[in-house]
Amino acid sequence: LVFGFVCALFYSFMSFGQITQWTDINYANDSLEGHKLDIYLPDGGQTEYKVVVLIYGSAWFANNMKQMAFQAMGKPLLDGGFAVVSINHRSSGDAKFPAQINDVKAAVRFIRAHADEYRLDTSFIGITGFSSGGHLSSLAGTTNGVKVYKVGDTEMDIEGNVGDCTSFSSRVDAVVDWFGPIDMTRMENCATTKGADSPEAALIGGTPAEHMDVLTLLNPMTYIDEKDPKFLVIHGDADTVVPHCQSVFFKDALSAKGRLEEFITVPQGQHGPITFNEQTFKKMTEFFRKQAAMDLC
């Protein structure tokens, strides 16, 4: 199953009012589809808006689902007064990890570099995503300030040098993780790795059990410290794609460092359906507004 596919069907196309938008902006100064983003501003009459970055779920298989992600989750964020930046990233078929987190960080740097051009208030940049997008959003949050990281004999460039805006910060200020896979060493029955045909195998380019150091580098929990932004984690207890225990593991690790704002388990929530609902969308928007020091709606 492709992470995020079902939720795309469930919350297919929302109705939007008058909004300002720019689409298919390349944030890496190249020609790759996976390096494009769309910017949407609410119809609020302000000169600039605080920002939430949005990342689609696809089991890391897709490089062009930014519009789907916006259709699925954009409206509550716009209604909450945020500019929404929905981004593509390279797929696991295009490039192996850490290319995907390099892309996310490049997009955030681009946002800061071009804030005036697109009426963005970068005093606050939140980030959210569902499924594999939840994983990348979480990883962006826990790797604020991390350039290169080594586990065992494996060293990876987490920040990367994608694009022309490398002098700008890739920091994010708050994270909402929607049912993201977190610990790939415990994806199978909450206890062990999945096999060579799993999405994470495609992402890292090998059988997970044979690349435990890479799985540790892939895991947002590896990097958690007291300086990380606050997190809201949302997961349905009937999710058969990404086990609910993944978010329990993450919740416990975030709590230990004081970085968890709230953990929401949605009863009977699946991988999108039921988990995506008016109440959880409101929780997301209120969380971001609180972290951005905006009045609650």
Predicted features along the sequence, with ranges:
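Catalytic histidine-centered segment of alpha/beta-hydrolase-like enzymes
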Residues: 269-278
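Mobile cap/lid helix-loop segments that gate and shape the active-site cleft of serine hydrolases
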Residues: 30, 146-163, 186-223
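N-terminal cap/lid segment of alpha/beta-hydrolase-fold proteins
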Residues: 17-47
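Primarily recognizes the serine-hydrolase "nucleophile elbow" in alpha/beta-hydrolase
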Residues: 109-190
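Short amphipathic alpha-helix adjacent to the substrate-entry channel of hydrolases
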Residues: 66-85
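Short beta-strand element of the alpha/beta-hydrolase
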Residues: 48-58
